Amino acid sequence: MKKQYFCNPLNMDYRYQFIQDMRSGEDKISREAADPSMILFQGKYYIFASMTLSVWVSEDMVHWESHRLPDSLPLYDYAPDVRVVGDYVYFSASRRGTICDFYRTKDILNGLFERIPGTFDFWDPNLFLDDDGKLYFYWGCNNVTPIWGVELEPETMVPKTERKELIYGQPEKIGYERVGENHSKMPLSEEEAVEKFKEFLKAQGKDADHLTEEQIGFAKIMFSQRPFIEGAWMTKHDGTYYLQYAGPGTEYNVYGDGVYESDSPLGPFRLAKNNPYSYKPGGFLRGAGHGSTMEDRYGNWWHTATMQISKNHDMERRVGIWRAGFDKDGVLFCNQQFGDWPMAVEQAKEDPWAEPEWYLLSYQKAMTASSSEEGREPSFATDENIQTWWRAAGNQPGEWISMDLGEVKDVRAVQINFADDKIDAPLPGERQGERYIDPSQHKTRWLLEASADGTNYFVLADKSDAETNLPHDFVVKEEGVQIRYLKLTVFEVPYNQNPCISGLRVFGFGNGEKPSAPQYQAERTGTMDMRIIIEPQTDAVGYNVLWGFAPDKLYHSCMTFMPEQNIGALVEGETVYVRVDAFNENGITEGSVRPLA
């Protein structure tokens, strides 16, 4: 079977939202899809994600199509959960203070969704069918309350047991549960949280000396710097129950999924040795939290999760997919070492640790453009950071951005990442609460040309007449194209905004040798922190820092382009082993493994 390729984030039509700011009353406009539930049902793969109004469908895990879901479903409710139960797919979503219903169908794309009246409210639901036919339900999304679990009556979906507290956040001991960029903030005491809230009120010119009980309760939750423990997903493998959960917050680069294990679906649960299970704090697009784990038709395991942009709004997010699995010792892992590089997929059993076939060629390459705004120069399109971008000075068709690779290289793929910036558009419809999701079919149209000499250009891909709106389009030239220059001309983007490119990313093969093995130091800087210092080397573009609880289980990784990297995701008291790999345009070279002192 011929290989096919994709590159995270998934290249889908992420719908725009108009979210009313409670302070200013103005709308913040951004795209979002998050909290994905992925299933295999009747031979096809389906992803249900928050705020998409749709389900994404694929035959091969590479090419996805979006299909509108019926308005009878709670499409404005976060974290849709789907599970296959017999001939049915069951659907539920999140709402606080209102009873949440269940829905089921035998035909996702064409069938009716039968409503099953609910009996309680929940947030971040997850349904799980055990081998013995018993049905369990998990939910929770809070920095005070736990992840809950209960057994349900299969016909009525009414709880058969009392809800049970399963897991709580422990940021004092579990490093990856701490909030902030790179886990930079420790939790506060209740007294400290209240004082911080008072400072906030004073800065707003409001009374901070006479707090109500309600305000004090609010402060203890929202100003505590405690993690939100959320996004449960249960997987059973060889008799062990793996309760996955997300934290510490979707707006951070360290949003990831941890995992607990048990011999029973309702616990007691023990923290797994391999944590965090899904974790991507570095690279072009960061974050890999609140997701789901699924086995495909060929016995390969996959994990899909939420990736963070959070520039136009905290909830500006995307969806990624990575290989996952269980090792010979039953350890659940997810491979995110090069998690936003092109990934090959074959319709067969595959190696979850296969290295990338192509390498990054575009990092910090020379860029020019038809125009740009100050602070949004074309160089931001090659800095491997989706949170920065080139923005043209105008919005007329024909604005362009161009890259010089430095010399002719063997190019195999190009990813074109569009950003949004300062969208000024009228509200297209009526809000539901604070939000309106735009169902319109916008268009993103462009032309990608290439040249070996800078004079004679040929078309690499033409979407100048496209009827689609794909912000992370991916062009594959599997046989290779010998080029030095690329030019992207933009003809249309949504809402007639100025075109913005956060990443014109090129992959293939350079003309040199792999980098030498990196020399590095690894030192503990706290019970949950370590610092990696790498000796700079001219033959490396960047590095991957790997770590794990055994020399042969280095399942966590952080990509960096700097010679120093802090890692705050350690678990107190756990043994840690480290390795640093170097990469450039020609390959990847592994470093030595050593214990963290």
Predicted regions and their residues:
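Extracellular Ig-like/FN3 beta-sandwich strand-entry sites
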Residues: 481-483, 540, 573-575
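Short beta-strand elements bearing conserved aromatic residues within extracellular beta-rich modules
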Residues: 150, 446-448, 543-545
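Aromatic, loop-rich ligand-recognition surfaces of beta-strand-rich domains
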Residues: 383-459, 470-520, 524-527, 535, ...
